[in-house]
């Protein structure tokens, strides 16, 4: 496996390149963006969800992924989310001055989702969601929890996600991705009251 990571010091931006025997992914994330997204993974529903994540989080996100979709979507979807988490971690730098913790409730028609995050450097993921169908488009619903876990663990943050209720699996997943974007938007913002200090009594994240 070959990985090359580069960060741009003049902005909270990172590019991650990941190449394995199964996939090739190039992903660029700008935290302080405007919600622009250009996603091409070969998995239409994943493209849609990441576009929503960027739009509602006001992140700029570009993804180019090529994977062994003749096998299934698992490797490609997983590696894209690994890269997304690593890009977020790298773009945040020391995390000095950020709000750090935030949450968001997002409805999508009959479905309601909650996502809470803590960018404190301790990776964890709790997902509570039940899906009635095995797939939405080209993406298996059994992968949804694993994708959020991949983002959280590689992004070094704590993520709790819950679908409180709903009937349509597309709506449930869409609400989750929107809520995740909005929670991360709030948590990554600078709080001027911190004066650029680390938001932890330990002095390091």
UniProtKB/Swiss-Prot annotation:
| The EC number(s) this enzyme carries | 4.2.1.19
Can you tell me where the transmembrane regions are? none
| Enzyme class, spelled out | lyase
Question: Pathway it acts in?
Answer: Amino-acid biosynthesis; L-histidine biosynthesis; L-histidine from 5-phospho-alpha-D-ribose 1-diphosphate: step 6/9
Where is the protein localized? Answer: Cytoplasm
Q: Which GO terms describe its cellular component?
A: cytoplasm
Gene Ontology biological-process entries: L-histidine biosynthetic process
| This protein's UniProt keywords | Amino-acid biosynthesis, Cytoplasm, Histidine biosynthesis, Lyase
Catalytic function, reaction form: D-erythro-1-(imidazol-4-yl)glycerol 3-phosphate = 3-(imidazol-4-yl)-2-oxopropyl phosphate + H2O
Q: Reply yes or no: does the keyword Lyase apply.
A: yes
Alphabetized Pfam families for the sequence: IGPD
- Spell out the molecular function terms from Gene Ontology: imidazoleglycerol-phosphate dehydratase activity
InterPro entries linked to this entry: IGPD_sf, ImidazoleglycerolP_deHydtase, ImidazoleglycerP_deHydtase_CS, Ribosomal_Su5_D2-typ_SF
Extract the NCBIfam families matched here: PRK00951.2-1 (NF002111), PRK00951.2-4 (NF002114), PRK00951.2-6 (NF002116)
Q: Hey, which family's this protein in? A: Belongs to the imidazoleglycerol-phosphate dehydratase family.
- This chain belongs to the protein called Imidazoleglycerol-phosphate dehydratase
Origin organism is Chloroflexus aggregans (strain MD-66 / DSM 9485)
